[in-house]
Amino acid sequence: SSYATALAAWMIDRHTSEANVHEVASQWRIQLLLSNRVYEELRTILSLHQELSLWDTLGTAKQKRIAASDHCIGALAIMQAEDRAGFVHIKRAITHLEQTGLAPEHFISGHDLLEAGLPPSSTIGNVLEAVYDAQLEGSVTSREEALSFAMMVYQEFKDS
């Protein structure tokens, strides 16, 4: 485990996982003179730990994003020490999710959307995220479906 994982486990143990651990992390950053890299890793692990506790309420796309994150292993290590049954449940779920790919290659990019006629805007990022979530959920299974879905999502953003 990383230094940030050890700090996160210590912080959760001392301040319980119900406390505002991000506020505590800010205080510890100052007191322990943590580097930006370690502090960001600590915050990420703490966030992932909180999300893991809500695992069964999360959608497939969110679960896959968590499982594919660089620091999921650290958050899982903490969960394993805290709640063995919960850890086993989530680990099995991740193994099942891996069968369909945790972080597959995106079917489309912003360049594809521009080529399809969408005007350059900040909305393109939101459209791409929605399309990728649909891809992770399994409701979009090809490049063509992704482009079609993207146009529909863009229209919804434009109309709202």
Enumerate the language-model features and the residues they cover.
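C-terminal subdomains that position terminal phosphate/3'-OH groups for nucleotidyl transfer/ligation
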Residues: 1-160
